[in-house]
Amino acid sequence: ADEEAAGFAIVNSLDDDQLSKAIIHPVSPADFSTRYVPRIGAVEYPDVIDLGMPQYRLTDKDRHACRLVRTEPAGIAGSELDETQQAHLLLIVDRFLERHPRPVAEKLQRDVRERGLDKVFFAWAGDTRPKTSHYFRVHTERFLIELVNSIASGDHIHSVIRDFDNDLGGDLLARNHPKPVPDVMPGV
């Protein structure tokens, strides 16, 4: 996938100072750090195991290192990357945003660029070679991108984009309806 290749291009082009910021842990989580919770909380920890890979276990140290703190992005700010690295970072962002309907994607792409790359963070966990277990995330004020490929040969990608304010399981009707909807509708 273009997104995975761009992630490798970034991490493998970083100098030592950049690497010390970008690599959050030498072990990748088995799956998303945010798991499959309906709304991302203030702090999220990856699961100890993935039911599909019970042999792949994380220690408490691994989980702590790979945790997501919503208000404190881990990794390196996009503004600390060189022009080529920034282009790869924006490619990742754009590819994930292109999963949205075009008007939504274009608005979010503009928003990322207008806010600036100092508000876009790239974090990596795991090995930095293809065909190995690895994970990266792109953390912005508005959304989170996660890509994990932790099966031993690195050949099974899971990826997600999550909106911090309008995420999985969000109840748009309840948030926007002036009165609670009754359990039983009159006359029905």
Please give the residue ranges for each predicted region.
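A cross-kingdom marker for long, charged
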Residues: 1-188
